[in-house]
Curated annotation (Swiss-Prot):
GO terms for cellular component: membrane. Belongs to the tetraspanin (TM4SF) family. Glycans are attached at residues 185, 195. It is found in: Membrane. Pfam families: Tetraspanin. The keyword Transcription does not apply. It is a multi-pass membrane protein. Disulfide bonds: none annotated. This is Tetraspanin-11. It comes from Arabidopsis thaliana. Residues 1-7, 66-76, 258-271 are cytoplasmic.
Length: 271
C-alpha cells in the first residue's frame, strides 16, 4: 500500500521541481533575450544554478518516494540533511551580519539617513572597489530618482522633507542633511556660500552634483542606502529561511518514514 509519507514527499518534491523548472526557464529566457538589462543579467547564472539544484534534488526525492527506489531516497535524504545544516549555518550568519545598520533619524525629516560605518564590515564589501561601479550604473539604469522629480511634492521643500524616502532615494538622490544645501526641487540643490565645515566633516557635500545622471551616486551616503536596502532584503530572507527550515525538517522526517516504507515493501515483495 502506498503510504502517506511517500505521498507527502512525492507531492512536496513535485512542487519544488516545478519551481526549479521555472527558474531554469526564466534564466534561459534571460540568456537569449536581448532586451534584458545588465543588472538583470547578473542574476542569470545564480538563478540557473539554483534551478538546476532544486530540480535534480527534487527528482531524486520523487524517484525515491513514488518508485520506491531506496538508493535514490537515501541519496536524497543525505543531500537534504546537508542542505538543512547549511541553511541553519547561513541563517545564523545572516542574523549577525545584518544585526547592525539601522538608519539615523534626522530632526524634522520624514526619512532616515544612512552611513556606511553603521553596517558590518562584511556587508560593506558589497559596495567596495569595482563592485560599486557596476551597482552605480544599475542605479542610474533603474532611474531610482525619477519618482522624486514628479508631482507637487518635488517642488515644495516642506512637503519633500516630510516625504518617506526609500534608503536608496535618501542616500543617492539628495545631499546629506548636514551639508545644509538649499532646496530648489527634489533633485536640484544649491550649496551654501560658506560650507567649509560641512565639507570637511562630510565628503559627500563636495561630491553632490546637480547633473541629473550623477546626483549623489558617487557619495558614501548612496553606498549606505544600497547597504540598507541589501540589509532589509537579507532580513526578509532570514525570515524566509526560518520558514523553509521548518518545511525542510518536516519533509526530511517524512522522507525517513518513506525510506522505511520502501525497505518494508521490498521485504514484503521478496517473501
Amino acid at each position: 500500500m502506498f503510504r502517506v509519507s511517500n505521498f507527502m514527499v512525492g507531492l512536496a518534491n513535485t512542487l519544488v521541481m516545478l519551481v526549479g523548472a521555472s527558474a531554469i526557464g526564466y534564466s534561459i529566457y534571460m540568456f537569449v533575450h536581448q532586451g534584458v538589462t545588465d543588472c538583470e543579467s547578473a542574476i542569470r547564472i545564480p538563478l540557473l544554478t539554483t534551478g538546476l539544484i532544486l530540480f535534480l534534488v527534487s527528482l531524486l526525492g520523487v524517484i525515491g518516494s513514488c518508485f520506491k527506489e531506496n538508493l535514490a531516497m537515501v541519496s536524497y535524504l543525505i543531500i537534504l540533511f546537508g542542505g538543512i545544516v547549511a541553511l541553519m549555518i547561513f541563517s545564523i550568519f545572516l542574523f549577525f551580519v545584518t544585526n547592525k545598520g539601522a538608519g539615523r533619524v534626522v530632526s524634522g525629516r520624514g526619512y532616515k539617513e544612512y552611513r556606511t560605518v553603521d553596517f558590518s564590515t562584511w556587508l560593506n564589501g558589497f559596495v567596495g572597489g569595482k563592485r560599486w561601479v557596476g551597482i552605480r550604473s544599475c542605479l542610474a539604469e533603474a532611474n531610482v530618482c525619477d519618482d522624486l522629480s514628479d508631482g507637487r511634492v518635488s517642488q515644495i521643500a516642506d512637503a519633500f522633507y516630510h516625504k518617506n524616502l526609500s534608503p536608496i532615494q535618501s542616500g543617492c538622490c539628495k545631499p546629506p542633511s548636514d551639508c545644509n544645501f538649499e532646496f530648489r526641487n527634489a533633485t536640484f540643490w544649491i550649496p551654501p556660500s560658506k560650507n567649509e565645515t560641512a565639507v570637511a566633516e562630510n565628503g559627500d557635500c563636495g561630491t553632490w552634483s546637480n547633473v541629473q545622471t550623477e546626483l549623489c551616486f558617487n557619495c558614501n551616503a548612496c553606498k549606505a542606502g544600497v547597504l540598507a536596502n541589501i540589509r532589509e532584503k537579507w532580513r526578509n530572507l532570514l525570515v524566509f529561511n526560518i520558514c523553509l527550515l521548518i518545511l525542510l525538517i518536516t519533509v526530511y522526517s517524512c522522507g525517513c518514514c518513506a525510506r522505511r516504507n520502501n525497505r518494508t515493501a521490498r521485504k514484503s515483495d521478496s517473501v
